[in-house]
Amino acid sequence: MFQSQKDGKKSAKGVILGYDLGHQFAQISYCTGDGAEPETVSAVTGTEQYNIPAVLCKRAGVGQWYYGKEAVKFAREEGGILVEDLLMLAQRGEDVMVEGEAFDPAALLALFVKRSLSLLNIRLSLYQVDALMFTVEELTPRMVDVLSRVAAGLQLKAKTICFQNHLESFYAYTLHQDEELRKNDVVIFEYNTSLRMLRLECNQRTSPMVVLIEQMEFPDVLRRVWAQEEQEREKQKQELDQLFAHTVRETLEEGIVSTIFLLGDGFKEGWAKESLKLLCRGRRVFQGNNLYSKGACYAMMERLNPSAEWKKHVYLGADKLKSNVGMKALRRGEDSYYAILDAGTNWYEAASDFDVILEEGNTVDFLITPLTGGGVMGRQVHLAGIPDRPRAATRLNIHVEMTAVNQASVTIEDLGFGELFPPSGKAWTATIQV
């Protein structure tokens, strides 16, 4: 439920969920919409085991399904049929055969998500959930389609369900940390199968402050299969420690890093000793694995009711609109700027529909203002064959919609002007570079 505040904003009265859906595990965090810090649901009551194995298990011969740790246990001890890689199967879209029966992979994924949400029952009712943010490693068009089907299958009462990638969750999480922790660059080292680094940089000289996130992969820093013999195992750990320390020196030698987050099960194996000392030199270092689900909560909180700090920043990721799109307009007799699309919006969500009065001429001019540098650029749409009418006697409906990260489709329709000048029925379509 939304409640109107005195300042006209809307705030979430209920609960916000952040759901991190991975190929191997899922995590669930939740918070109220009043700015409270998110909490993460444990897969085992009374522990900090946040990872929920993203698997299902079917009991042989009957239509009974188990999920998560219970599914793994039932498959191991009772001979159930284990279905793994649910996210990958849903992306492929091919039927999953279990005991000769075909199952829709998106429906199986929705079943897993629905069952996993039952972990919330001892804390809250799902009827209290107003908004849900899914976060995944990479948000492709196919992934959006899969998540949309999953969301529909959940049959939640939530008014808002959105999707974002891990980079956006990292950004949202960072902006909700103490300012001292994000005074300079913020880095994630993520170590599951192989090592990945994310580096968040903020240009504090721009308004709004532009945030960029650099990604680096280190395929040579792979998870180790530890030897049984203790001496050989210790040698493996020392070699990995040295390799990671070398990677840290190479990647962090430029710029200043305030904070480092170590994510992933690979950092839980007790090998990072000298490299950890190196990381801690003049930097704050945190270890955990629930950053993305918490970041998803924060992102949804900001989407519903943006904070003052959020409004000061704009994240320009790969899928984000890099420029503001607007036009000059006359308001109450004074020249002004009319904002159409805002930089920092996901390009596939960026659209605007509005009416204007054409003052004169037969063109509509747009202003493109890049936040990554460079001057303001003009884009013009020519209205061929528009009826000749007196000054300011033509009303136009304009629809602008992004069709790619740097391209917008513009549709303009002649609405005429009251009874004096009926609509001509003419419409114009153009593509502009943004």
Where are these regions (language model features)?
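Early-domain small/polar-rich strand-loop-helix modules and first-structured segments
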Residues: M1-D95, A152, T160-C162, S169, ...
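Conserved phosphate-binding loops in N-terminal lobes of ATP-dependent enzymes
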Residues: S42-M133, E217-A245, E250
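A short acidic Gly-Thr/Ser loop motif
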Residues: S11-A12, Y19-F25, E180-R196, E201-N203, ...
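Conserved phosphate-binding catalytic cores of ATP/NTP-utilizing and phosphoryl-transfer enzymes
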Residues: M1-G14, L156-I188, L291-E309, P390
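Glycine-rich phosphate-binding loops at beta-strand->alpha-helix junctions
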Residues: L132-V144, T247-L276, G288
